[in-house]
């Protein structure tokens, strides 16, 4: 702005000097030049018109004044034309300066936009690198989740296999329990039959006792009665002991069976609870698998979005690279334009220097003209010499005018070229402004896209944070479930060991029950054999008792007592089932002497049955 003001002041000063010079020239120099010309003309044509003193006549003066007026008018017109040219040049200079400032501001704005664009590109590159790093972390987390999912699948398969094995073992235990229950029922049925047989035998023994009591026993047989009573008491005690032992065995066996059934029920309950827990765990694992699948779907969508964003970022980088190339070209063009402007400024400076030199010459000429006018006003006598000098000066002025015309033509050509260049520059600047507007629009859209991408990235980061929190919770749940499954495995292993131990015990008890059943069966068989033997012995005893035991001189021959063999037979039938005891059954004794029973001898035949061995019954006579 200061340079423009100084230039305007200089131009105003030069214009003022030109006007003053032309006014002074029209007043003095022009008249002198015309007078000299007229003098020359008159001097050559009519020498009588001159006076003796060398002065002009009034007519010459009037002609000179008219010529001076015409020359003054022509010089004034020429001065106005020069002034207009100077004003046009000044206007063009101001336009060029304004364009220069506009170009400088546009260049500065373009440099700022390029700097901002470069910063945005660096920021985008940093965000892209961060997004790549985040995508890598997501990929690693996804691979870890897939590995964890595979481990969970393997663990679930192992648990399902163990559950199937446990269910099979439970089914086997249930089957064995059913078999044991059936065998226990059979044994209880057999025991019930044995107890019924035992009760029948006891009833039969009681009937025999009743018959023995109803029988008439002679008084002298005190020893036999006492022995019989002792035997009965012993038999009763043995029967009571056997009943107590049998009842105790049955009670213990029933308690064992009840305990086993209770244990089996508890085991079934525990297995049902474990199956329920396994089902709940499977449901949880299924839910976790569903969540994992949803998370994988979300991760896949996020990867797709990241891929799209990377594609957009790559396109934006390509656009930025193209824009940078365009900006480089524009900077080159701006550099060329600046170079042209510098050249134009140099030319303008040269032109100003030439104008300054011309002004100095004009000042010198004005000074010279002033001195000449002063000399012409003071010395009219030296007019002829001065006319020659003025002719030379006019020649110089003509040459200067020719130079000025040439300079004006050069300035017009230069101004035309500059106007063309300025038109081209304005067209280029307009195009650049349009491109910059498009670039600004693209940058605005890119900034909006980047804002949306940042919002999406922020949401994705929040989602990933939530997913990481869920994954951490799931890992904790998986750890707890693994611990629970480990505890359950340990419990199942212990239960399997307990079941195996119980199964072994059940098998041992089953074998013992089989042995007891075999013993009972053998006892029943032995009882049956004993009954048969007792029947045979009764027959043999009847045969033997039908004959006299002593000589007939001492005992009567009539031994056919009606109640003599019935107690023995009944005693044989009601023989006790215990093979470890020996029961003695006594037949009713004979007469005390032969006088009471005249049919018998002096001594009676009293047979006693006792068990000597396990399989033999001996008979002695008293």
From Swiss-Prot:
- UniProt biased composition (Basic and acidic residues): 57-74, 251-275, 283-332, 339-367, 374-388, 395-420, 511-546, 567-580
How is this protein annotated for GO cellular component?
Answer: cis-Golgi network
Annotated region described as Disordered, given as residue ranges: 1-82, 251-496, 511-580
Acidic residues bias: start-end ranges: 477-489
- Coiled-coil regions listed: 100-534
Alphabetically ordered keywords of this record = Coiled coil
Q: Which family does it belong to?
A: Belongs to the GOLGA6 family.
Q: What is this protein called?
A: Golgin subfamily A member 6-like protein 7
């Amino acid at each position: 702005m200061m340079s423009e003001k100084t230039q305007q002041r200089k131009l105003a000063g030069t214009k003022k000097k030109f006007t003053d010079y032309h006014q002074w020239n029209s007043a003095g120099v022009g008249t002198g030049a015309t007078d000299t010309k007229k003098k020359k003309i008159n001097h050559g044509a009519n020498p009588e018109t001159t006076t003796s003193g060398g002065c002009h006549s009034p007519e010459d003066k009037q002609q000179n004044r008219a010529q001076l007026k015409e020359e003054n008018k022509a010089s004034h017109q020429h001065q106005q034309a020069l002034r207009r040219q100077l004003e046009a040049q000044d206007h063009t200079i101001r336009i060029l300066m304004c364009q220069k400032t506009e170009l400088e501001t546009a260049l500065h704005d373009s440099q700022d936009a390029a700097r901002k664009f470069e910063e945005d590109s660096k920021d985008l590159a940093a965000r892209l690198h961060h997004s790549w790093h985040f995508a890598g972390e997501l990929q690693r987390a996804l691979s870890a989740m897939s590995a964890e999912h595979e481990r969970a699948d393997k663990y679930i398969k192992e648990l399902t296999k163990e559950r199937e094995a446990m269910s099979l073992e439970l089914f086997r235990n249930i089957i064995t329990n059913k078999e044991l229950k059936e065998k226990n029922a059979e044994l209880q049925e057999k025991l019930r039959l044995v107890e019924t047989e035992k009760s029948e035998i006891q009833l039969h023994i009681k009937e025999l006792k009743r018959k023995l009591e109803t029988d008439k026993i002679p008084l002298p047989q005190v020893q036999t009665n006492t022995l019989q009573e002792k035997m009965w008491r012993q038999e009763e005690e043995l029967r009571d002991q056997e009943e107590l032992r049998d009842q105790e065995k049955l009670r213990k066996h029933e308690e064992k069976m009840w305990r086993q059934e209770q244990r089996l029920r508890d085991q079934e309950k525990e297995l049902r609870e474990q199956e329920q827990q396994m089902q709940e765990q499977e449901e949880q694992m299924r839910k976790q698998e569903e969540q994992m699948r949803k998370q994988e779907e979300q991760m896949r969508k996020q990867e797709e979005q990241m891929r799209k964003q990377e594609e957009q970022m790559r396109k934006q980088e390509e656009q930025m690279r193209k824009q940078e190339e365009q900006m480089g070209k524009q900077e080159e063009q701006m550099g060329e334009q600046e170079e042209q402007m510098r050249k134009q400024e140099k030319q303008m400076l040269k032109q100003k220097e030439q104008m300054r030199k011309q002004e100095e010459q004009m000042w010198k000429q004005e000074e010279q003209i002033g001195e000449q006018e002063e000399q012409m006003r003071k010395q009219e006598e030296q007019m002829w010499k001065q006319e020659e000098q003025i002719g030379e000066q006019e020649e110089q002025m003509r040459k200067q005018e020719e130079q000025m015309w040439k300079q004006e033509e050069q300035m017009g050509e230069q101004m035309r070229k500059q106007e063309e260049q300025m038109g081209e520059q304005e067209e280029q600047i307009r195009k650049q402004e349009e491109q910059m507007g498009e670039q600004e629009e693209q940058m605005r859209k890119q900034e909006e896209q980047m804002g949306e991408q940042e919002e999406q990235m922020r949401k994705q980061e929040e989602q990933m944070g939530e997913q990481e929190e869920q994954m951490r919770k799931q890992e904790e749940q998986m750890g707890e479930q693994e611990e629970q499954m480990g505890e359950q495995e340990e419990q199942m292993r212990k239960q399997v060991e307990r079941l195996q131990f119980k199964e072994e015990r059940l098998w041992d008890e089953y074998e013992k029950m089989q042995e007891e059943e075999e013993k009972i069966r053998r006892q029943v068989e032995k009882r049956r054999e004993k009954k048969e033997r007792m029947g045979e012995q009764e027959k043999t005893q009847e045969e033997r008792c039908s004959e006299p035991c002593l000589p007939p001189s001492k005992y009567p021959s009539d031994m056919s007592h009606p109640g003599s063999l019935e107690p023995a037979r009944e005693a044989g039938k009601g023989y006790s089932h215990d093979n470890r005891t020996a029961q003695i059954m006594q037949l009713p004794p004979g007469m005390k002497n032969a006088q009471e029973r005249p049919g018998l001898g002096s001594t009676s035949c009293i047979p006693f049955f006792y068990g000597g061995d396990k399989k033999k019954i001996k008979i002695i006579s008293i």
